Amino acid sequence: MENELPVPHTSNRASVTTNTSGTNSSSGCISSSGGGGGSGGRPTAPQISVYSGIPDRQTVQVIQQALHRQPSTAAQYLQQMYAAQQQHLMLQTAALQQQHLSSAQLQSLAAVQQASLVANRQGSTPGSSVSSQAPAQSSSLNLAASPAAAQLINRAQSVNSAAASGLAQQAVLLGNTSSPALTASQAQMYLRAQMLIFTPTATVATVQPELCTGSPARPPTPAQVQNLTLRTQQTPAAAASGPPPTQPVLPSLALKPTPSSSQPLPAPPQGRTMAQGSPAGAKPSGTDNAPETLKAGDGNCNMEGRPGPGRAVPAVATHPLIAPAYAHLQSHQLLPQPPAKHPQPQFVAQQQPQPPRPAPQVQSQPQLASVSPSLALQSSPEDHALPLGSVTQALPLQCSTTHVHKPGNSQQCHLPTLDTGSQNGHPEGGSHPPQRRFQHTSAVILQVQPASPVTPQQCAPDDWKEVVPAEKSVPVARPGPSPHQQAIIPAIPGGLPGPKSPNIQQCPAHETGQGIVHALTDLSSPGMTSGNGNSASSIAGTAPQNGENKPPQAIVKPQILTHVIEGFVIQEGAEPFPVGRSSLLVGNLKKKYAQGFLPEKPPQQDHTTTTDSEMEEPYLQESKEEGTPLKLKCELCGRVDFAYKFKRSKRFCSMACAKRYNVGCTKRVGLFHSDRSKLQKAGTTTHNRRRASKASLPTLTKDTKKQPSGTVPLSVTAALQLAHSQEDSSRCSDNSSYEEPLSPISASSSTSRRRQGQRDLDLPDMHMRDLVGVGHHFLPSEPTKWNVEDVYEFIRSLPGCQEIAEEFRAQEIDGQALLLLKEDHLMSAMNIKLGPALKIYARISMLKDS
C-alpha cells in the first residue's frame, strides 16, 4: 500500500438504471458498502446517466453542472488518451502475437481490436457528442455511437467485453478526472492507465472525452468507482450476453444482456443525471452498449435482483477496485502504462468466452465487493465465475496488459486471471487488492473472463511473475492458490519478490491454454506484462509491484525498528548497542575502590566493557553489597539511608539537601562587608548547625541570640560559633569539589572560606561578643518584628545599597514584607538594578534561615 495514492473517500453507491430498447427491468441500484476493497467509506454517491437510445444510435449526453478542470487540461488529457489508445491497440496486437496465443485466440483478439477500433472511431466521430464544458474533443467520443460499432460489439462477446471494459475504463477515467481532490497530474495518470488498459477497445477514446466532460468537482473515487462499476457492469453484460449463470452475483451487471450490447444503459438515474455533470455522466455512448447488454440482454435481472446484494457486483467491484486501484494506478500503473502499452492482452482475455465458469466466481467475490463476483461471471459468458476479486484480477488480464504498461512491472502483478477458481479462494482478501488496483480493470476482468474460467486467485504476488513465464497456462492455474495469494497481495508491498514464486505454475493446471493465460503469460515482457503484469498488479492492488516490480516493492532492510519518540528518531539495531556506564558512575566506583570501601569490587570493574546484562548485574551486586553493610548519614538533615541512594558525593540523601547546603555555604562566603558578614555569620552558622543536629544545640543558640550581652558565658558562645563557622567553611570547600554545580561564588571561594574560618579562630572572644552586641543593638533579633525603619537601616547597612534604602522606606516594607520579597519584586516593582537586588535577596534569604 506504500505506493497507493490517496484517493478521496466518497460514497461508493452508484445507481445504475439501464434502459434497454425493450425493457427497464434490469435496472439496478449498485451500492458498494465499505466492505469492498477499502472503498467503503465514501460519503457521496456520484450519479451517471447514460442514454443510449438504441444500439445504432448510442449517444451519451453529459451535462456537467460545474467543470472544475480547465478546458486546456481536458484537451491535453484527450490528446494523451487518443495517442495512448492508438499505441495500445498496436502494441496489443504485437504483444498477443508475441505471446504465442493460439490462432483462435489471436483471431478473437484481432476481431476485438478491430471492433474496438471501429467502435472508437465510430464512437468518436459519429457517436453522439458528449456535451462537456471541457474541450470540444471530449464531446465527440462515443464508443458504440455508430451502429457499426454496436454491431461489432454485439457480434462478438469478446468484442463486447472489450468495448464494455473500455467503457468501464472510461468511467474510471471520468472518476479520476472528476475527482476534485485529484491533481491534474494524477488525473492524467489515471487516464493513461485506463487508456492503456482498455486501449484495445475504442472505449478508451470515449473514456477520454468523458474524463474531460466529467465534472472534476466530484470526488474522484466515488464517481470514478461508480462510473467504473457501471461501465464494468455494462461491459460484462455486453460481453457475456450469452451466459446468464453468473448474473446473480452482479446486480447491476445483469450480464445476461443479450449479445446486443447496443441496448442503451441509461442506467444511472441515481447520480448519473447528465445534467449532473458527474464524472460518470460522461459515459460514452459506446459504453452504453455494455450497459445495455447488462440490463437487458438476458433480462436476467441480475442487476435488479442483485441490487440486494448491494453493490451490483460489477459496480461494487469497480468501486473498491477503483479507489485503491486508482491510487495504485496513479503512482505505479497509470504513468508507466503509456510506455508499457501492454493493453493487447486485454483482447486476448476477452476473446475466450468459451470456458463458462460463472457460478464459482460469484460466491467468493460477494464479500469483497459483493458485486465483483457477478461482474467477473458476466464479463465472459463462460468466465463469469470470477469473483469480484477475480474480476479485478481478470481485469488485469485484459486490462492488465494496460496496467502493466504503466510500469510494466509494477502492475505486472499478472492479474493471474480471474478464473472462477480463484474467486472462491480469495474472494475476500485477494480480490480487495486487485479491486483497488484495477478499478479500471474491473471492466477488463469481464473481458478477460470469457477467455478463461481460470481463477483470479493468482492475486498472490508470487504468482504474478511466474504467471508471465507460464504465459498461457499461468493465469488459469491460479484458482488453487487464490485464497492465500490474495491474502498475500495485501502483504505484497512488503515483499513482491514472492510473486515470482511458482504459484504461476499452478495456473497452467487450469486453462493455461486459454487466451487469458496467454495474456498473462508474459508478465515480464512488455507486451505480455499487460496481460500478466496486469493481473499481478491488480492482485497486488496494494503492492503494485509485480514480481518484476520488485524495486517498487517495499525495500526490505535488515530488521531495524525505527521509533519516533517525542521528536527523536530512534532506530533499534539487530545487536545491542555498546553501552557503558556513565563516566560519573565509573568515576565514583573508582574512587570507592581506591578508598577501599568495596575491596571486592575492583575485579568487577572489568565488566564495564561487557554486555548490558553483565554490566547491570555487577552494579546491582555492588548496590546490594553497599546497601546492606554500608549506610550513610545525610550531613544536612541527618537522615540515615543506604549508600547507593546517596547521590554523587554520598554526603547528602537528596539533591534538595545538597542544594540547601550549597546555599548555606554561598551565604557564608565573604561576599559582604567583613563586619556585616561576621555579624551575620554569628547567627547563621549557629542556625545551620542547629538544623543539622536538631538536638540540644537549638536551645543553646537561641539563648545566645536572645541575650545581647550573653547570659551564657561568652566563651561558650564564641567557641560554638567559631567551631560552627570552621566546620561550615570546611564543608563548603569539601562540597565544592564533590557536589554538582555550586554557585560560582561558592565554588570559586573555598579558599577564601577557609581563610575566613581561620581568621574567625584568631578573633578574640571579646571581639565576637562585640559584634553580636552591635548587631543586636541596631536591629531586633527577629526580622519579622522589624518595622519600616528597621528595614531601612538593614538595607542601608548593605554594601552599595545606601541609596536603595529610601525606596524600601517609601514602599513601606517592614520585616514581614522583607522576608516575602523576591528578586523580581526588587527589579520590576522597585526598579532596583540586578546587582543590588541580588545582594539584598541574598541577605533576605539569610534572614529567613536564621
Curated annotation (Swiss-Prot):
Short motif (HD1): ranges: 550-579
Residues carrying Phosphothreonine: T611
CDD domains given in the database record: SAM_Ph1_2_3 (cd09577)
Cross-link (Glycyl lysine isopeptide (Lys-Gly) (interchain with G-Cter in SUMO2)), chain numbering: K590, K592, K624, K694, K839
Organism per entry: Mus musculus (Mouse)
Record's subcellular location: Nucleus
Alphabetized PROSITE patterns for the sequence: SAM_DOMAIN, ZF_FCS
Protein name: Polyhomeotic-like protein 2
Coiled coil: none
Keyword Metal-binding: yes
Phosphoserine: residues bearing it: S613, S743
Domain SAM: 786-850
Domain commentary: HD1 motif interacts with SAM domain of PHC1.
